[in-house]
């Protein structure tokens, strides 16, 4: 009974086709605008009202002190490690990375994709991963655990003792090299 495959589960093998890749790429994009694992978009959004506008001094929280009081800590540069906005930003970075990495793993095994579309999707995914880690570097610094599609889930060998800036730049360079401006390849408006 321990060898039974769970029912109702989408495996990477089941998604290793053109349609599955498109679904996974859409899932990666969805992390930009919708909650990932229950986070509040105010707390972790890459649009950065809190971690850009408030933290950078371009915006004020406003309202009264009891309304999103944890934002006051960020605005006053007095953020405690228990501040939920910090946790949610961390979760967002790694949930985005996980979505992108799964899509990249499946993309390599999808045999029914046209090569130019495969390269375009790879470029989009590399851009999204670079964005996620860039957001992480803005809040946590450049020494973050960098997880890419070659890492196994729960890999104990992922360390945070290396500056990941060059890895993020490499993802951006890969994205630029693979993205296309051909409407037939791009597909939907609004993609990277």
Predicted regions and their residues:
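Short acidic-aromatic linear motifs embedded in glycine-rich loops, typified by GG[WY][YF]DAGD(H)
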Residues: 1-124, 128-166, 183-188
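Amphipathic alpha-helical segments of tetratricopeptide repeats
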Residues: 176-177
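Acidic helix/loop microenvironments that form the catalytic cleft of cell-wall polysaccharide enzymes
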Residues: 190-192
């Amino acid at each position: 009974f321990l060898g039974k495959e769970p029912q109702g589960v989408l495996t990477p093998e089941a998604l290793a086709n053109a349609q599955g890749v498109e679904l996974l790429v859409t899932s990666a994009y969805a992390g930009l605008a919708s909650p990932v694992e229950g986070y509040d978009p105010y707390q972790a959004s890459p649009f950065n009202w809190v971690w850009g506008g408030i933290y950078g001094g371009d915006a004020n929280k406003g309202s009264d002190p009891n309304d999103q009081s944890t934002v006051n800590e960020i605005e006053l540069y007095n953020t405690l490690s228990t501040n939920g906005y910090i946790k949610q930003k961390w979760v967002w970075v790694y949930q985005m990375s996980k979505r992108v990495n799964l899509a990249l793993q499946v993309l390599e095994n999808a045999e029914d994709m046209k090569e130019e579309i495969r390269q375009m999707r790879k470029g989009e995914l590399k851009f999204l991963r670079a964005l996620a880690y860039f957001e992480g570097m803005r809040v946590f610094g450049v020494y973050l655990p960098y997880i890419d599609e070659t890492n196994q889930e729960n890999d104990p060998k992922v360390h945070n003792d290396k500056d990941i800036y060059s890895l993020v730049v490499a993802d951006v360079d890969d994205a630029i090299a693979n993205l296309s401006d051909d409407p037939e390849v791009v597909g939907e408006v609004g993609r990277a």
